[in-house]
Amino acid sequence: MEALRQRIEAAFETRQDISPSSVEPSVRADVETVINMLDKGQARVAEKIDGEWHVHQWLKKAVLLSFRIFDNGVIEGGDTKYFDKVPQKFADYDEARFKAEGIRVVPPATVRKGSFIGKNTVLMPSYVNLGAYVDEGTMVDTWATVGSCAQIGKNVHLSGGVGIGGVLEPLQAGPTIIEDNCFIGARSEIVEGVVVEEGSVISMGVYIGQSTRIFDRETGEVHYGRVPAGSVVVSGNLPSACGTYSLYAAIIVKKVDAKTRGKVGINELLRIVD
């Protein structure tokens, strides 16, 4: 793995000189190896080690190299055709393979090769970009999008129209991460490498980026780029220092533990926030 990483890093430094017609066969083979590893879940762009998320930038570099290496090609898609550099993940799947992996895919869901889909996931008509990791037991609901290299945990529900931001460039940025057992309400957007920690519930229509203030009304704390574990979050506003206007903020209205979540439905958690 270390030798592969070094070769990818070296190739990335010369990426401006790489094209589908000029790429060295060895570089193409290395990039294909990485894409296949990401596709099978043998590698992931970010992983939690000792309680902290670590980003493997070289894997992101391999994904970026793939756009310079692979040319557009025709992709069959039911009653139509597409023309793109990245093939479809399920293009070669048959019934036996879908059953073996425990994946349910509702047309016209689109998943690009190089993304991992865990067992017992359900993909409604949605979009999953390459480099993404969707763990087992997760529901990606209708018109939800999972951006490039985003990390989605186990037993997550991404409701209709949810947007999880991708982040290939700028390269130093971390991917957007939704940890295990989270619920993201309809039409919410979580972007720019924000981490939603385990067991959190995000209400409908909440928008969180790195500059969004995440206000905990119980403690008065303001967080940026991170929703603490077990938070129940709704959209709101905070007053300006001068008191003449207010600006959008995400408001943590309560905290819940796994036991409470197991006993109380999501709608009930969100119903009383006063």
Curated annotation (Swiss-Prot):
Domain of life: Bacteria
Gene3D superfamilies cross-referenced by the UniProt entry: Hexapeptide repeat proteins (2.160.10.10), Tetrahydrodipicolinate-N-succinyltransferase, N-terminal domain (1.10.166.10)
Assigned GO CC terms: cytoplasm
Listed pathway(s): Amino-acid biosynthesis; L-lysine biosynthesis via DAP pathway; LL-2,6-diaminopimelate from (S)-tetrahydrodipicolinate (succinylase route): step 1/3
Cell location: Cytoplasm
GO biological process assignments: diaminopimelate biosynthetic process; lysine biosynthetic process via diaminopimelate
Keyword entries, A-Z: Acyltransferase, Amino-acid biosynthesis, Cytoplasm, Diaminopimelate biosynthesis, Lysine biosynthesis, Repeat, Transferase
CDD domains: LbH_THP_succinylT (cd03350)
Matches recorded under SUPFAM superfamilies: Trimeric LpxA-like enzymes
Substrates-to-products reaction catalysed: (S)-2,3,4,5-tetrahydrodipicolinate + succinyl-CoA + H2O = (S)-2-succinylamino-6-oxoheptanedioate + CoA
Family to which the UniProt record says this protein belongs: Belongs to the transferase hexapeptide repeat family.
Complexes and interactors: Homotrimer.
Name of protein: 2,3,4,5-tetrahydropyridine-2,6-dicarboxylate N-succinyltransferase
Species this protein is from: Shewanella frigidimarina (strain NCIMB 400)
Originating gene: dapD
